[in-house]
């Protein structure tokens, strides 16, 4: 038996659509696997009632097939589905790391990223790695057609999750198919600034580099109260605010000592909009961790 803790993640980070990702210290899924002749999946925890246990419809089932590793699998969900925090990716990442150890497949963490991404395709329709990469590798990740690169970073964050759902498929439908040259230049410059900030663990640079004039404004329209929550976070000292992944979670970058105030401001802003929400005071952290074997 192998048990793995797989962290929630935030993808895109504003200017890095389908490229950037970051592992969060909380929340997380816990995945336990045992060898079996036939694969079965049991899901408990947050939003378990919305997650199929049929291996053909669960992200974990695709990972099992790719590794040829049938198992009894238990997923204790700490990452709510349809949250913008890489819920399906956390399960797929945890299963990939756990099954690799259980069956002694000998694959590196980097080699597990595309395998876990196949699981993501079950949910979103596309095998993207921007969530599974940080959930497996940890830190800040950059994923392109050439592969994934990761760097350790220490950036304080607040994630505010409203009690509404935005599906990845719906969020992809609103993404513009074209962008102006001015918007392209602005986005590239911001993405480069963010990447430098991550390498330096500089929350001011990271926050300054999150602005995105193309994708984020369209996705923000799907989140009631987004503009007010964003403004409240900045007023409380956040250096950058954006939609986390497909949403509805909102990510705020903070300096040390400011997370509590930023979290309270974001919660109050959602409350003023008539929406319940939960705030996680977190930071960029480790990837999937083996807890027991």
From Swiss-Prot:
Record-listed E.C. numbers: 2.7.1.39
Chief place of localization: cytoplasm
Record keywords: Amino-acid biosynthesis, ATP-binding, Cytoplasm, Kinase, Nucleotide-binding, Threonine biosynthesis, Transferase
One Pfam family here: GHMP_kinases_N
Binding site for ATP: 80-90
Class of the enzyme per the UniProt entry, highest EC level: transferase
Cellular localization per UniProt: Cytoplasm
GO cellular component: cytoplasm
InterPro entries to which the protein is assigned, alphabetical: GHMP_kinase_C_dom (IPR013750), GHMP_kinase_C_sf (IPR036554), GHMP_kinase_N_dom (IPR006204), Homoserine_kinase (IPR000870), Ribosomal_Su5_D2-typ_SF (IPR020568), Ribsml_uS5_D2-typ_fold_subgr (IPR014721)
An MF annotation (GO) of this entry: ATP binding
Superkingdom assignment: Archaea
GO process terms (BP): threonine biosynthetic process
Pathway: Amino-acid biosynthesis; L-threonine biosynthesis; L-threonine from L-aspartate: step 4/5
Reaction equation(s) it catalyzes: L-homoserine + ATP = O-phospho-L-homoserine + ADP + H(+)
Family matches, as PANTHER family: HOMOSERINE KINASE (PTHR20861:SF1), HOMOSERINE/4-DIPHOSPHOCYTIDYL-2-C-METHYL-D-ERYTHRITOL KINASE (PTHR20861)
Main function: Catalyzes the ATP-dependent phosphorylation of L-homoserine to L-homoserine phosphate.
Assigned protein family: Belongs to the GHMP kinase family. Homoserine kinase subfamily.
Protein name: Homoserine kinase
Source organism per UniProt: Halorubrum lacusprofundi (strain ATCC 49239 / DSM 5036 / JCM 8891 / ACAM 34)
Gene name linked to the record: thrB
